[in-house]
Amino acid sequence: MTDICSLSLTAVAQALQKKELSAVDVTTACLDRITATEPHLAALLYVNAENALARATTLDSEGPDAARPLWGVPVTLKDAFSTRGMPTTAGSRMLEGYTPFYDAFAVQKLHEAGAVILGKTNLDEFAMGSSTENSAFKVTRNPWNLNKVPGGSSGGSAASVTAGQCFASLGTDTGGSIRQPASFCGCVGLKPTYGRVSRYGVIAYGSSLDQVGPLTRSVEDCARVLTAIAGYDSRDNTCDPRPAEDYAATLSSRPLKGARLGIPREFYGQGLSDEVRAACEAAIQAARNQDAELVEVSLPHTDAAIATYYIIAMAEASSNLARFDGVRFGHRSADIKNLDDLYVHSRTEGFGPEVKRRIMLGAYVLSSGYYDAYYRKAAQVRRLIRDELLAALGQCDALLAPVSPVTARDLGGNTADPLQIYLMDAYTLSLNLAGLPGLSLPVGLGAKSGMPVGMQIIGKPFEETQVLALGHSLEQALPGIGRPAL
């Protein structure tokens, strides 16, 4: 008998529509998988078992609905999405015990599409990290090697999808937080164009950088989820009004044959590990074998992207997290004598060390006397980085680049050196600065580490159709990496 949890989202969705499987069958299989794997992975912060089974039972009683593309499909959510009646912590003691009274827009869209919400996944606190080790509650492990990190900050989502606990998970990407864990865990992850998916109901980190996207096991699955969650929402004034497309229906619209693909010189220079380089070069050769045209392009300001990103992200974080003060919701210190004590003690007790570091640095770059030297300068360089990327994309259909310079590192490694951790985002954060779409696709296993390697397909604004179609074509041209023996 086929293991339900090993199927793709697309295969399960089709079987559900044909009544070859019931929503209760699929949901029960995923909950059993969670029970078996969660003690090893620690991917989930909250399991919504009772409500998920009730939802599946209701769906079965109503019968399949072809107009609902995720009918009966179990999914998980990064715990940065507001969920009515379910705890939402952002991985922080500051929000421990907080239960919203409304759903985020993307969660509403999943409900409308017929999905079954299984639970909430672990993340770095307030999405600030690249390993999911910064969570206040637990440390998530990589399904390929339990001694390795899953990446971050959406590490729980990537681990959950790869381990077969669910068929898709929603994450957020501020500087690579969907793409990097997808690369480390060997699944597909998409950061859409800024404004393609509403951020309403998402706990904000960097408001000009954050974007919502799916993590799945295949590009076709990713396209199906994006179709479900994309669309205009008036409650997010950065949400773009142009209508969403049926991304799954257009996957054959752009084959690799005849495609002009750019290779950014700066992404393949010093610092790229040998095993990541080899896997990416093999993927480039696979594209060439499909008659794609490969051209070298240059992005001269790549070296400035890390500093630019962290100045802007930390400045926005210091502003966004000012609302967590112990007054309205979240952690409230008991050790208070006056209003100042309430603010200081609540925030000191509620926030972890990495969040405090970013708040302090953000406040510094926004302070009088330093605003022009840091924040204003970073905003200017951000424009240069965006212009360079758009100029490069003007020469080709998409760019191919590594997601991370290395494969997943050991748990506990480099945790005392924030700068080394920040460097892990060197190849992903430019897309957030520019607001461009990027798809992380597994292209091989490291020859030395045996860990997954991901490659980014970078596209022009709102050209997710082409990014996904090229990703689908490249996925078909590659042998695949299999699944971890968890």
From Swiss-Prot:
It holds the Pfam family Amidase. GO terms for molecular function: ATP binding; glutaminyl-tRNA synthase (glutamine-hydrolyzing) activity. Keywords: ATP-binding, Ligase, Nucleotide-binding, Protein biosynthesis. The active site is at residues 78, 153, 177. One of its GO terms (cellular component) is glutamyl-tRNA(Gln) amidotransferase complex. The gene is gatA. Its EC number is 6.3.5.7. It catalyses: L-glutamyl-tRNA(Gln) + L-glutamine + ATP + H2O = L-glutaminyl-tRNA(Gln) + L-glutamate + ADP + phosphate + H(+). This is Glutamyl-tRNA(Gln) amidotransferase subunit A. InterPro entries: Amidase, Amidase_dom, AS_sf, GatA. Disulfide bonds: none annotated. One of its GO terms (biological process) is translation. It comes from Desulfovibrio desulfuricans (strain ATCC 27774 / DSM 6949 / MB). Allows the formation of correctly charged Gln-tRNA(Gln) through the transamidation of misacylated Glu-tRNA(Gln) in organisms which lack glutaminyl-tRNA synthetase. The reaction takes place in the presence of glutamine and ATP through an activated gamma-phospho-Glu-tRNA(Gln). SUPFAM superfamilies: Amidase signature (AS) enzymes. Heterotrimer of A, B and C subunits. Signal peptide: none annotated. Gene3D superfamilies: Amidase signature (AS) domain. Belongs to the amidase family. GatA subfamily.
